Amino acid sequence: LYAGVITRPESQQWFAQSLPKFAAAYDYTAIMAMPYMENEQPLSRKEAARWLGKLVAEVKRSNVPLDKTVFELQAVNWRTKQPVPAEEMTDWMTLLKKEGVKNLAYYPDNFLQDQPPLKTVKPAFSVQR
């Protein structure tokens, strides 16, 4: 699901996507939580984290249970064609988990070049406290 249909409800008609309808029809709904892709202007690291926080807040306002969502993070900044630093990704995961998000994913997974480095991101996937 494009994040824009959550943050800008008027775009639901353009994409024919709706978080509440998807959540009612599927066990899980993957949300493209990709701040560097969704915004027209380049974002700083701090702005990207703030954008993710706003996205979670909008999902909570939708009354769709967070455990029915998967927040799919971007591992590449397609604007710069550079990997998102693994430390930034783990910071995003920490932020999302603090907000109650349980299901995390990322794309793309360049396992042949260990990007993002598994030893860095794997511990962040644990929801154990």
Q: Which residue ranges define each predicted feature?
A:
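Aromatic-lined carbohydrate-binding surfaces of glycoside hydrolases
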Residues: L1-R8, A33-M37
